Amino acid sequence: MKKTILLLSVLLAMIAWYPLLVITGWIQKFTVTVQCPLAAYFVLTLAFSLISLYLMCLKEKTVNAVTTILSGLLVPFSVANLFTWVWENRTFWFLLLALVWVVFSALLMYIYGKHAFFQGAMMGGSAVVLFLVVLLCLLLVFFSIGRITIVQTLPSPEGTYYAQVIDDNQGALGGNTLVEVYDTRKKIDLFFLSIQKDPQRVYWGRWGEFQNMKLEWESEQVLVINGRAYEVD
């Protein structure tokens, strides 16, 4: 029984840490960046799948209130996991890998969930949300809605800041050219990810301007964009 609860807890931690961290970042104004995100997500997906298969193949399965709660939480967090990974990376492979998490989570809840009503309510609600999330993710991946591309990065003379020119492509809605400045002092590097305070947006222009944009640092705290100076806080 302890092994089952422990492994379900490990799976819940694996599936919940990224959505919770990213959503907290949206609220608290910091950015989470995973190094080699596709490789990292593939390894996490493989580990999640192997642990799930082990739990599914156990001959004597422990089913109680704790396993019901833990397995039930896997399903909504798997949907949140899908949305945040695809939203932050916007490629088909992330959508495909995220669906693996959803499938295994649903199977584990079916096996280790104790109450039929709880199972039905959780599965029904999650299915509706999953449909909407997958639809949104397909639009993001295949129709370039909200696709953001960094076209230029320029560090300040002393390396305290770096400016990025961004092509914010909104598809049929047009888009924008953005210039954002990051403070390298407000960054935490961890094992395979980094956490950094959101940048200061110093310029917001028309889509396509980045193609002819001239960017240079006049001093450590003054950035010149197309001949106009912008002071960095």
Regions found by a protein language model. Give the residues of each.
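Membrane-embedded alpha-helical segments of integral membrane proteins
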Residues: 28-45, 61-113
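Internal/C-terminal transmembrane anchor helices
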Residues: 116-145
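Alpha-helical transmembrane signal-anchor/signal-peptide segments
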Residues: 142-163
